[in-house]
């Protein structure tokens, strides 16, 4: 595989950079060349955050070029649209369905699009595929809302064409999180896997 490009986005405090590092380490363990990049200075709580994970046999820069992302993994629906120009034709937008309305929406200066409007933009305007589910709800079910990022990663491992096995990713999570947090993260991962299988009829 020449290269596989992931753009991860959301708002500060959602664990985006942790997710990027977990996927990067998993790709490294799978034997790929890996580059992980992030946009600095934007990870204050509720500010927009973007990280890049690139891996394959032929990967050089850390930044994913526009129009080259195989997947946009978004922790917040509108954040997926903010960075939609990164998506390649036929790429996948996979998002947590739980919105965190931006300040402009809270102040009544803008309206928040419906999930159907977001889907339409992804599919019709950008020729992409769109999947959304409430990852936050599953993280709470697993035992801790901060594992939302792990729920999303678990789900991502089941999407068609994703090159990393669930086992590679789980291995990295086991050695990366504090020992007392391993069980809750494993539960979160498996709930994500299950949700994706149900959505994709696997």
From Swiss-Prot:
What InterPro entries is this protein classified in? Indolepyruvate_Fd_OxRdtase_bsu, IorB_Oxidoreductase, Pyrv/ketoisovalerate_OxRed_cat, Pyrv_flavodox_OxRed_cen
Q: What is its EC number?
A: 1.2.7.8
Presence of keyword Oxidoreductase? yes
A GO MF label:
indolepyruvate ferredoxin oxidoreductase activity
What keywords appear on the UniProt entry?
Oxidoreductase
What start and end residues bound the annotated signal peptide? none
SUPFAM superfamilies reported for this sequence: Pyruvate-ferredoxin oxidoreductase, PFOR, domain III
A Pfam family annotated for this chain is POR
Could you tell me what reaction this enzyme catalyses?
indole-3-pyruvate + 2 oxidized [2Fe-2S]-[ferredoxin] + CoA = (indol-3-yl)acetyl-CoA + 2 reduced [2Fe-2S]-[ferredoxin] + CO2 + H(+)
Q: How does it assemble?
A: Heterodimer of the IorA and IorB subunits.
Q: What functional role does this protein have?
A: Catalyzes the ferredoxin-dependent oxidative decarboxylation of arylpyruvates.
Q: What is this protein called?
A: Indolepyruvate oxidoreductase subunit IorB
This chain is encoded by the gene named iorB
């Amino acid at each position: 595989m020449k290269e596989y490009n992931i753009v991860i986005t959301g708002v500060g405090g959602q664990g985006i950079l942790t997710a990027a590092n977990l996927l990067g380490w998993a790709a490294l363990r799978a034997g790929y060349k890996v580059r992980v990049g992030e946009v600095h200075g934007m990870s204050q709580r509720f500010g927009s955050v973007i990280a890049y994970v690139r891996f394959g046999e032929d990967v050089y820069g850390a930044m994913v070029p526009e129009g080259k992302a195989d997947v946009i993994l978004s922790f917040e629906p509108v954040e997926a649209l903010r960075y939609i120009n990164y998506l390649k034709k036929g790429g996948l937008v996979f998002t947590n369905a739980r919105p965190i309305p931006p300040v402009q929406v809270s102040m009544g200066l803008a309206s928040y699009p419906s999930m159907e409007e977001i889907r339409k933009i992804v599919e019709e305007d950008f020729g992409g595929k769109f999947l959304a589910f409430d990852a936050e709800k599953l993280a709470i079910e697993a035992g801790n809302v901060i594992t939302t990022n792990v729920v999303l990663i678990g789900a991502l491992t089941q999407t068609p064409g994703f090159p990393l096995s669930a086992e590679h990713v789980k291995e990295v999570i086991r050695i990366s999180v504090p020992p007392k947090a391993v069980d809750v993260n494993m539960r979160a991962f498996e709930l994500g896997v299950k949700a994706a299988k149900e959505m994709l009829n696997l």
